[in-house]
Amino acid sequence: MPEMGALLLTTPALAAPGELLNLSLNASAVAPEGAVLLAMLATLLVDLAGEKVSTRWVPPICYAGLGTALLLLALQWNAPLEPSFLGAFLPDHLAIAFRAVVALSTLLSLMISWRYAEQGGTPVGEYAGILLAATLGGMLLCGATDLVSVFVSLETLSVASYLLSGYMKRDARSSEAALKYLLVGSAAAAVFLYGSSLLYGLSGSTSLEAIGQALLSSPTPLAALALVFVLATVAFKIAAVPFHQWTPDVYEGSPTPVVAFLSVGSKAAGFALALRLLVGCFGSFDTQWKLLFTVLAVLSMTLGNVVALAQTSMKRMLAYSSIGQAGFVMIGLVCGTEDGFAAMVLYTAAYLFMNLGAFACIILFSIRTGSDRIADYAGLYQKDPLITLGLSLCLLSLGGIPPMLGFFGKIYLFFAGWADHQYVLVVVGLITSVISIYYYIGVIKMMVVKEPQEASDAVKAYPPVQWSTLGLPPLRVALVTCVVVTAVGGILSNPLFQWASDAVAGTPLLQQAIASVNGSSLG
């Protein structure tokens, strides 16, 4: 991205000193993050006024902050591309797309959280404030273009995630999940810092663009070692095998709305980080990191979907499912083509709705029964057809059944992989997709096919459905929204793919990588 460097170099001749600072900072680029920050501060201040005031005002404050952030992101789509904070942040189309996924995942996670938080005795203001802090870190991470801004954003997201996973203080499993997450996450942060120090020593700069140019001109074995450390951190954030060990325990022990956010928002930020670091810094090691990610993708798709077959907990099953889903997204990353990157963006957005829709159903069921055991869903159709329908559609979409949105997302990934001759990834993806359908269909069959006398004890004691109960309307809105987008989104897959393609086309970093791949293939 030489035009960015030229922009900063020519600015002094064009602007006065006071204007120079404004142009270099370009704070308007992070206006969406500013809206989230203001909402976070407001929730914490309102929380000081007491529980009743907090319960009344925190939700609308969060909706206003996140809604404003999404609106500002939409306005940035056609704005001129300018670096922010002295080149440490770049609001390109890739950043806008992933920031929108993070913000929208938080909005939907909060909508499915209120009733769950009230039932568990969780202070709403504190919970929302920490979740917004995680959102702030995730959104900044999507556009960070400097090692310092990457690390600060990464740790903001990580520390808030540790607090959220252990927020149910009365639950021993939640405390255990937080401790495991903290230990593994701290190790990943230390590994990233060491890799960053190697990159700084090799290039003399913390800018990802400058590091990429330095490694391109003089690749060394030490740079390959830095690649291994950075790749390990990225694999931890996206829960790729073999850096996935924390995922099942953390997902099972953490509060369910937190798991919903971690499975989508945190993972989306992780994939944005992967694109920034691997494509931006390690272009000279393109063959090596793609080979490593091919292995990670095969392991993630295989282990995630095979181990999910044996799970008895819905949250644990979706944890292993998310590991497999990360493997599918990695197909687009390994391709390195325009269609591959676009399919990656599209599937991440599709995963947002189908996964959060499934978690909304799980939360509703756990509120009414106190259970997340798969066996307890037996005969649910007799008592709650809405949850049964919503969960069935979301699981079918996760499995890639047509005409759901997830089917078209996988089709675009597999087509991109096949066109790039990634035959192993495509074949493994197809086989593991069939395996995933088996355990998804198993849950649906249990809910629908079981006769009334075969219903589980939890379903037999299922309370009458009362949508007017306090806190349930936002949950119902989130559930219906996710289910409708999941079911109808397949029909609109072409416009969605065009949006994803525009995101790739508006990202100079990816265009350079695509041009490099096309040039090498022609050569």
UniProtKB/Swiss-Prot annotation:
Its EC number is 7.1.1.-. The chain crosses the membrane at residues 29-49, 57-77, 94-114, 128-148, 182-202, 223-243, 255-275, 291-311, 317-337, 345-365, 389-409, 424-444, 477-497. Keywords: Membrane, NAD, NADP, Plastoquinone, Quinone, Thylakoid, Translocase, Transmembrane, Transmembrane helix, Transport. Disulfide bonds: none annotated. It catalyses: a plastoquinone + NADH + (n+1) H(+)(in) = a plastoquinol + NAD(+) + n H(+)(out); a plastoquinone + NADPH + (n+1) H(+)(in) = a plastoquinol + NADP(+) + n H(+)(out). It is a multi-pass membrane protein. GO terms for molecular function: NADH dehydrogenase (ubiquinone) activity; quinone binding. InterPro entries: NADH-Q_OxRdtase_suN/2, ND/Mrp_TM. One of its GO terms (biological process) is photosynthesis, light reaction. It is found in: Cellular thylakoid membrane. One of its GO terms (cellular component) is plasma membrane-derived thylakoid membrane. It comes from the Bacteria. NDH-1 shuttles electrons from an unknown electron donor, via FMN and iron-sulfur (Fe-S) centers, to quinones in the respiratory and/or the photosynthetic chain. The immediate electron acceptor for the enzyme in this species is believed to be plastoquinone. Couples the redox reaction to proton translocation, and thus conserves the redox energy in a proton gradient. Cyanobacterial NDH-1 also plays a role in inorganic carbon-concentration. NDH-1 can be composed of about 15 different subunits; different subcomplexes with different compositions have been identified which probably have different functions. Belongs to the complex I subunit 2 family. This is NAD(P)H-quinone oxidoreductase subunit 2. It comes from Synechococcus sp. (strain WH7803). The lineage of its organism: Bacteria, Bacillati, Cyanobacteriota, Cyanophyceae, Synechococcales. The gene is ndhB.
